[in-house]
Amino acid sequence: FPTRRSSDLNTIRYTDGFLASLITLLQKMNSFSAMLYTSDHGEDIFDDNRKLFLHASPVPSYYQLHVPFLIWLSKAYREENVEVHEAILQNREKPVAGNASVFHTMLNLAGIQTPYRADSLSVANRQYLIRPRYYLNDHNLPKSLDKIGLKKEDIEQFRRNNLVYP
């Protein structure tokens, strides 16, 4: 299993390098740009004494639920969209339910007005509201984090990392 752990860590390193390269490219272009990156799920890679690996368990672990949510704005974008930039800064420490927020945040970043955009779900908006976070179980049903049977170790990880549970 050490090879599996190395493989997963290498994907994290690759993604980190890719995002850094993309940001560098956007900076060199001196473009008016915004970038949002997130992941659809986390991964267990032997993170604790349970030796869990992969994802999609009926009862996920903290490591399957905690995913990155990164927004980068170019200097030109920040200067032209001060309110959006300030809203992102205001909301940066708040918990994000990525599955609910990505669509609305991207519409907000792109400046698209539509009846489908809910500003209370956009991290790039001052109206952003913290919502309960859900896990889509193996029967395609959303379940509140406190209703999926998380283990004590996983709840402790949320608290240790100052993340809201639930």
Model-derived features: positions:
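Catalytic domains that recognize anionic headgroups
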Residues: 2-166
